[in-house]
């Protein structure tokens, strides 16, 4: 093998036998310069011979696919044999012709010393080269030598072995080895076995003695001095060796690159053909790539195999697409490999378990974001940027909210956070863009496109136009545009004028504000109309979704399940409704039965009360009759008879309408009359009982008659002949009272109202009227209660009573009686909205007004006294 470091001439042999003439040892004093000169001459001749042999082998060698075949060169072998013989003979001649004294040094030591003086350049090696001298990327040159070296160039008896001689050139260590050369360690193996014995003698007789094979270091300085290089020959040799080296290097690389280019071209062509063809492949991308590779394997199997072995081409069995706005994750995999196994290989068998907070955060992100994966990606990028900024401030101790108290602890924390900050800094590098700045106006942006568009706009500095790409200035706008086009090939745009009075909707500019306002009114109407027209409806959203997303395939099993679930839900709903109806019907029947029972109980209780009342009346009648019989003897016979007749008529005609209260009242009155025996009282009692007998039932409570409808009668007629069957409902407590005089006494006794009034005053009608509904009332408290319950108006007096916990009474809505907190009950329980009202009292005769009813009464009594021609009516005016 020929390299730039060494030149090897190899011949296969089993034994190495070199016959030389016997040499006599010489002393160191007898060594002359002639021996050194001869050795130099011999080495120069050997180099020339080896160079010529190498050149002939390289010229005549055949190259195929980057490999150089071995050649057997007979001429080189013969030349080398002659050179070796000449070198041996010259050494023998020098040793035999020297005029030195004989010493007792053995023959082996003399030979070793002679070899050292010869610069140790001849190395005898016996090795066999496997693979016929061929390596992976280089070749080895073999030369077979059959003749054995003898003393006069003849063969020794019985020896027909081949010799392998390796001659190393120590002067070529620094040159570059040829591509594919075998390592020097493999070429220069030590021969630890004993050297073959040589048969030599001074008289030509062979004597066997051991010959040592010496391996010398190429880096020995003494050898370099002894054997200087030949510049001319070495340069020529290197030129001849570097040419095949470059060819051997270039060819494999070119082959790989060409194979890759051809494969990529075929892949592109195949994928382009398959992309437009309809197919039923479930793994579109993976099957297309594998089909393209298989098609190329059939055409160039060796090149594709070499790419696979060099790990340039990898056959995929799984292709995964990252999450996007269209899909969460898409994986195409080999059907022989289950999906679970693919996921385990991609993400690992043990998936990280999320904490409760992370699960909650992920669920919230899915609820509030339609594309949660992309949102999570952007959120992570933002969090990393914020963390990097925070950690940078902590590590460099800047922008801190306060000075750290413990400096050592802070330094430890900063040292721990520094690698984390560096990692985040490297991770966030793609998201940090360099700010570009306009040199004319100072505009800054991270986008190069935005900066390019900005620089296309003319910049006016106040007195002249400045080019944004160079230092050109001009006062004329057209000339500056021509400069942009000629110098920079850019069509410049004029700078937009600043808006004076722009429209907020269409951004149209106006010179005057009034014109802008007129335009804005019409523009707003048009904008609202167009927005209502262009507003998408529910059908538009439906059509848009149908256009964006394909309709999923119909699965009969899923439809059947959905239909069965819908039927089951309908049946459950129907059964639930039927159960509700049955329950409601049962509740209605129970309520009806309860009402019947209550009605029966009430009827029975009423009959019982009537029977008791009749028994009491009989007893009273008997008592009265007995007493009257005793008293009739005196002066009251007629009166007692009339009383007895009235009582009997009352007992006979007493019906279901008589209440226990009236019976008790009659009993008390009769007892008092009998005790006092006052004729006037007995006459009045008889008249009242006659009236009650004439009215069998008490009618429902009508409203108080108006003053205009009530005729003005004298006191005697009104007292004796008041309209029968009329009942009054108290405007303060809602209690029903028969007869006007009883109602007056009810107001005076129970409610302490209308004190000092007589029945004649009530004949003129109720004095107080509501300005909202024109209803009339006898008392001020009744008017206040009506305003609150019916109209939600609160007077100042009622508000003062509420503050003092004196706003009691009966609620008209629910009928409950309250000692206080009536207003709070209306607001909380009945949701009545209350507002304040101021009541002004005005005189009907004159224009007098006041806020107090007592003041109005004093005014009427003093200014307008009672007379037959005047009526006393006060009208209330409400100022809300």
Swiss-Prot record:
Function: Has a broad role in development, specifically in the genetic pathway SynMuvB that negatively regulates specification of the vulval cell fate. Required for fem-3 3'-UTR-mediated repression in the regulation of the sperm/oocyte switch. Acts by regulating the translation of fem-3 mRNA, by binding to its 3'-UTR.
UniProt cross-references to SMART domains, sorted A to Z: ZnF_C2H2
Organism: Caenorhabditis briggsae
Keywords: Developmental protein, Differentiation, Gonadal differentiation, Metal-binding, Nucleus, Repeat, Repressor, RNA-binding, Sexual differentiation, Zinc, Zinc-finger
C2H2-type ZnF: 436-459, 465-488, 728-751, 768-791, 809-830, 841-864
InterPro entries from the UniProt entry: Zinc_finger (IPR050331), Znf_C2H2_type (IPR013087)
PANTHER family in alphabetical order: C2H2-TYPE DOMAIN-CONTAINING PROTEIN, PR DOMAIN ZINC FINGER PROTEIN
Gene encoding the protein: mep-1
Quaternary assembly: Interacts with hda-1, let-418, lin-1, mog-1, mog-4, mog-5, mog-6, pie-1 and unc-98.
Record-level GO BP terms: gonadal mesoderm development; nematode larval development; oocyte development; positive regulation of gene expression; positive regulation of transcription by RNA polymerase II; vulval development
Name the record gives this protein: MOG interacting and ectopic P-granules protein 1
Biased composition (Basic and acidic residues): 23-37, 154-170, 183-193, 235-252, 350-364
């Amino acid at each position: 093998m020929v390299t730039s470091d060494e030149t090897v001439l190899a011949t296969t042999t089993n034994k190495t036998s070199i016959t030389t003439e016997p040499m006599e040892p010489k002393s160191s004093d007898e060594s002359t310069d002639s021996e050194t000169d001869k050795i130099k001459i011999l080495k120069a001749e050997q180099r020339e011979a080896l160079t010529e042999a190498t050149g002939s082998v390289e010229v005549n060698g055949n190259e195929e696919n980057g490999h150089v075949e071995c050649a057997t060169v007979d001429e080189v072998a013969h030349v080398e044999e002659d050179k070796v013989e000449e070198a041996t003979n010259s050494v023998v001649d020098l040793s035999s012709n020297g005029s030195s004294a004989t010493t007792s040094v053995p023959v082996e030591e003399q030979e070793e010393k002679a070899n050292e003086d010869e610069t140790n350049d001849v190395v005898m090696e016996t090795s066999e080269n496997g693979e016929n001298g061929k390596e992976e990327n280089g070749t080895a040159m073999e030369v077979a030598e059959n003749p054995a070296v003898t003393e006069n160039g003849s063969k020794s008896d019985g020896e027909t072995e081949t010799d392998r001689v390796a001659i190393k050139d120590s002067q070529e260590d620094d040159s570059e080895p040829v591509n594919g050369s075998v390592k020097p360690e493999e070429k220069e193996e030590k021969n630890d076995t004993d050297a073959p014995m040589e048969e030599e003698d001074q008289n030509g007789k062979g004597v066997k003695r051991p010959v040592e094979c010496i391996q010398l270091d190429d880096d020995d300085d003494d050898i370099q001095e002894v054997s200087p290089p030949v510049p001319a020959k070495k340069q020529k040799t290197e030129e001849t060796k570097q040419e095949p080296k470059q060819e051997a290097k270039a060819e494999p690389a070119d082959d790989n690159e060409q194979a890759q280019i051809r494969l990529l071209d075929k892949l592109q062509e195949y994928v382009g053909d398959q992309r437009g063809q309809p197919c039923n492949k479930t793994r579109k991308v993976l099957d297309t790539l594998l089909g393209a590779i298989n098609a190329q394997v059939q055409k160039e199997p060796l090149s594709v195999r070499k790419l696979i072995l060099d790990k340039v081409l990898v056959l995929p069995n799984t292709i995964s697409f990252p999450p996007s706005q269209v899909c969460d994750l898409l994986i195409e995999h080999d059907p022989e490999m289950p999906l679970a196994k693919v996921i385990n290989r991609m993400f690992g068998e043990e998936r990280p378990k999320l904490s409760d907070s992370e699960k909650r955060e992920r669920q919230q992100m899915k609820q509030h974001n339609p594309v949660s994966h992309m949102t999570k990606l952007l959120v992570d990028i933002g969090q990393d940027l914020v963390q990097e900024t925070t950690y940078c401030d902590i590590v460099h101790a800047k922008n801190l909210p306060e000075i750290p108290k413990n400096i050592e602890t802070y330094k430890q924390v900063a040292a721990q956070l520094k690698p984390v900050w560096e990692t985040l800094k490297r991770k966030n590098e793609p998201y940090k863009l360099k700010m570009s700045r306009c040199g004319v106006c100072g505009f800054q942006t991270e986008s190069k496109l935005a900066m390019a568009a900005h620089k296309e706009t003319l910049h006016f500095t106040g007195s002249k136009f400045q080019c944004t790409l160079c230092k050109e200035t001009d006062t004329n706008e057209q000339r500056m545009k021509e400069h942009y086009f000629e110098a920079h090939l850019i069509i410049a745009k004029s700078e937009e004028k600043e808006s004076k009075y722009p429209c907020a909707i269409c951004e149209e500019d106006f010179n005057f504000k009034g014109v802008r306002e007129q335009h804005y009114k019409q523009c707003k109407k048009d904008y609202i109309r167009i927005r209502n027209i262009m507003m998408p409806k529910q059908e538009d959203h439906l059509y848009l979704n149908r256009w964006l997303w394909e309709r999923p395939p119909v699965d009969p099993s899923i439809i059947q399940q959905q239909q069965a679930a819908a039927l089951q839900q309908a049946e459950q709903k129907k059964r639930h409704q039927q159960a509700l109806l049955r329950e409601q019907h049962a509740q209605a029947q129970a309520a009806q039965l309860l009402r019947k029972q209550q009605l029966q109980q009430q009827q029975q209780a009423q009959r019982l009360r009537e029977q008791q009342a009749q028994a009491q009346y009989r007893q009273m009648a008997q008592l009265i009759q007995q007493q009257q019989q005793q008293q009739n003897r005196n002066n009251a016979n007629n009166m007692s008879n009339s009383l007895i007749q009235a009582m009997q008529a009352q007992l006979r005609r007493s019906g279901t309408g008589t209440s226990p209260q009236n019976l008790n009242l009659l009993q008390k009155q009769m007892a008092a009359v009998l005790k006092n025996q006052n004729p006037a009282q007995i006459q009045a009692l008889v008249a009242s009982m006659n009236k009650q007998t004439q009215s069998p039932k008490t009618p429902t409570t009508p409203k108080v008659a108006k003053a205009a409808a009530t005729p003005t009668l004298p006191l005697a007629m009104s007292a004796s002949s008041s309209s029968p069957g009329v009942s009054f409902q108290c405007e303060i407590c809602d209690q029903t009272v028969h007869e006007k005089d009883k109602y007056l006494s009810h107001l005076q006794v129970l409610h302490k109202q209308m004190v000092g009034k007589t029945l004649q005053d009530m004949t003129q009608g109720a004095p107080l009227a509501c300005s909202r509904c024109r209803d009339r009332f006898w008392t001020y408290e009744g008017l206040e209660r009506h305003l609150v319950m019916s109209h939600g108006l609160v007077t100042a007096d009622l508000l003062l009573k509420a503050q003092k916990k004196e706003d009691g009474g009966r609620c008209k809505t629910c009928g409950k009686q309250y000692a206080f907190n009536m207003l709070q009950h209306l607001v909380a329980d009945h949701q009545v909205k209350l507002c304040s009202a101021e009541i002004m009292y005005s005189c009907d005769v004159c224009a007098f007004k006041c806020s107090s009813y007592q003041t109005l009464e004093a005014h009427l009594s003093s200014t307008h006294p009672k007379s037959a021609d005047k009526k006393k009516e006060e009208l209330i005016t409400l100022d809300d």
